[in-house]
């Protein structure tokens, strides 16, 4: 009977989507002139907020301005980017190195901005990769990926990457439970044999560098999303779960049988105590840690061999389970840290837990059994309240700092505003269509900036001019400064956004670097003056020490290269001015171009396969004589005796 109900719900969702505005979009009067004025940013003026929006299957992180919705930059993180040579040049290839080898693609999901005292501080953005479990740190000085750490004992790194209120930890859960350690076992033996690991990655407060501190071994549920405690609940982390049935097939039905799943409350302060007491097991685990240096402009890749593991079933006080209806997706903590909102995708109401009640229930041992040795708290003992009949298919909740919560509803395609404490719905606005995540700048912190809300929709249909079968994902901007939400803007996004993080521009923009100081360039092949340019042969390897400046390369004529050589072009941009990058591309190179920022050195490899004279040129327009910024390489037969030489202006 229940299986039929689930199938009916899925069918209803499908019919809802198919019926969306079949006659096409009616644009007349869709946005009032006042709304257009609110998103207009005059030429030469700045947006008031940054938005960092994940790319999902693009693997990247996009930077937008609010309220204009203008795209400023796509930061390559987990996928190669030929425009910026990320993953192609010799300096960044190892950023995509994993224990599985070089992986040129990733699935980026949940960005989170670093925090100090529970307030976003604008230094770094952390973002998770779902497919090959990893966490990346993006520098908001350079808007480049500074670090990627792989997560062992994990599969489907979804309940990530959220930071504690002083960025002590960035946390990574696992969507899929797997055998830990991995071994050959029948999938049908899932129950009781598959486990999950919740990873706590320590962050250096000065450099931002990450280190996997410990993992908490958990029952074989699916861990969907997570958020940190804050304020009064600082020191705890909360994870939503589904598939507490431990099903291994047809999960849309078999993982939807229990009336309640769990929100797991993890006491990471207690975990630190257990680590100090030595109550952990060191488990073999191979994972790769990649760090990019702004001094050497290169990546250092390290393979780690072990991890400290705490077994939640054997360590009292480490984890408690709070029953939550029904397949909760979002697990969101309000700015005070008192309320934990569980968005049960298949529930007719929304459950809100109380942190204070949870502590009291623990103290009074108000348990309703256990799961694999972990206490289950009584549902009524932690319940703060329920939001009744808010909508269909609740997913995610953010907060405005004024006592209001905002939740997305996928099936009924809307954002719903409700009051904390009274649990009453006070406003709702449609989205177009089937909204997933939402973001309020600072809405995942102790200090939300409750001016704007961005809804990230999963279905676009007729919102934009058609572009063939694949349609861009739609985002919508709402003004939430008043009592009622107001739709201001539709804007397209890159990939499939799963979450976003935002902050006022004043918090972020001061960190941005204008150029790299040439005297601080410690790249081993840096050439800081045209007097030092040269070409060096080492067997079949040839190293070209090259410079670029408006409007020429030095050297720009090279001879003595032979078929079968491996030629490394190490190009240093000598400019010391803002917004003067140089590019370079070589005919026949089986890599991307380079795009080199002022003061930076980058390298591409060219392996000539034909005799001849082959040109290279600057790919980034830099001056009135940009077209003249070019050169030639002469390639001779393998057995030739042409002398290796190089020149600029025949000198």
Over which residues does each language-model region extend?
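N-terminal edge beta-strand
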Residues: 536-566
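Predominantly soluble domains enriched in secretory-pathway, periplasmic, or organellar proteins
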Residues: 20-534
């Amino acid at each position: 009977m229940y299986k039929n109900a689930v199938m009916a719900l899925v069918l209803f969702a499908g019919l809802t989507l198919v019926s969306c505005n079949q006659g096409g979009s009616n644009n007349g009067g869709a946005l009032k002139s006042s709304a257009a004025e609110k998103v207009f940013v005059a030429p030469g003026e700045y947006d008031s907020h940054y938005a960092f929006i994940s790319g999902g299957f693009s693997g990247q992180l996009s930077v937008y301005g609010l309220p204009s919705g203008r795209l400023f930059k796509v930061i390559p993180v987990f996928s190669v980017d030929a425009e910026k040579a990320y993953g192609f040049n010799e300096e960044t290839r190892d950023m995509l190195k994993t224990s599985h080898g070089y992986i040129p693609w990733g699935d980026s999901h949940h960005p989170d901005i670093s925090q100090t005292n529970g307030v976003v501080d604008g230094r770094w953005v952390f973002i998770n990769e779902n497919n090959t479990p990893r966490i990346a740190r993006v520098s908001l000085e350079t808007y480049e990926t500074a670090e990627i750490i792989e997560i062992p004992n994990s599969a489907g790194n979804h309940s990530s990457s959220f930071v504690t209120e002083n960025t002590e930890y960035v946390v990574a859960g696992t969507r899929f439970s797997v055998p830990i350690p991995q071994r050959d076992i029948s999938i049908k033996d899932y129950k009781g044999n598959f486990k999950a690991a919740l990873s706590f990655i320590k962050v250096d407060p000065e450099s931002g560098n990450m280190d996997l501190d410990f993992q908490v071994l958990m029952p074989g549920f699916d861990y969907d999303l997570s958020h940190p405690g804050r304020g009064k609940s600082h020191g705890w982390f909360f994870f939503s779960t589904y598939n507490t049935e431990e099903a291994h097939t047809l999960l849309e039905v078999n993982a939807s049988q229990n009336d309640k799943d769990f929100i797991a409350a993890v006491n990471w302060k207690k975990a630190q105590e257990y680590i100090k007491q030595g109550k952990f097991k060191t488990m073999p685990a191979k994972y790769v840690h990649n760090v990019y240096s702004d001094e050497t402009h290169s990546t250092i890749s390290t393979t780690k061999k072990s991890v400290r593991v705490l077994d939640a079933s054997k360590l009292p006080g480490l984890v408690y389970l709070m029953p939550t209806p029904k397949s909760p997706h979002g697990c969101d903590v309000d700015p005070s840290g008192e309320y934990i909102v569980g968005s049960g995708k298949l529930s007719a109401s929304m459950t809100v837990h109380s942190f204070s009640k949870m502590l009291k229930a623990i103290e009074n041992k108000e348990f309703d059994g256990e799961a694999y040795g972990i206490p289950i708290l009584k549902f009524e003992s932690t319940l703060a309240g329920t939001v009744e009949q808010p909508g269909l298919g609740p997913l995610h909740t953010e907060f405005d700092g004024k006592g209001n919560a905002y939740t997305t509803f996928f099936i009924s395609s809307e954002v719903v505003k409700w009051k904390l404490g009274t649990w009453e719905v006070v406003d709702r606005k449609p989205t177009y269509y089937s909204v997933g995540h939402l973001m309020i700048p600072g809405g995942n912190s102790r200090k939300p900036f409750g001016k704007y809300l961005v809804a990230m929709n999963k279905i676009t249909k007729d919102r934009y001019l058609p572009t063939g079968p694949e349609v861009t994902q739609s985002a919508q901007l709402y003004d939430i400064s008043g009592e009622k939400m107001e739709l201001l803007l539709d804007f397209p996004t890159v990939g499939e956004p799963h979450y976003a993080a935002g902050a006022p521009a004043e918090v972020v923009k001061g960190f941005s670097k204008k150029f790299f100081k040439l005297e601080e360039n410690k790249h081993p092949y840096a050439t800081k003056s045209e007097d030092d340019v040269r070409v060096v042969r080492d067997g079949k390897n040839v190293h070209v020490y090259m410079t670029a400046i408006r409007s020429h390369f030095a050297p720009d004529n090279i001879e003595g290269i032979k078929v079968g050589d491996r030629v490394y072009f190490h190009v240093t941009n000598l400019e010391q001015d803002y917004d003067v990058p140089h590019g370079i591309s070589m005919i026949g190179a089986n890599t991307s171009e380079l795009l080199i920022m002022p003061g930076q050195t980058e390298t591409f490899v060219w392996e000539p396969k034909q005799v001849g004279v082959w040109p290279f040129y600057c790919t980034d327009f830099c001056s009135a004589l940009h077209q003249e910024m070019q050169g030639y390489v002469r390639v001779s037969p393998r057995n030739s005796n042409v002398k290796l030489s190089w020149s600029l202006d025949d000198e």
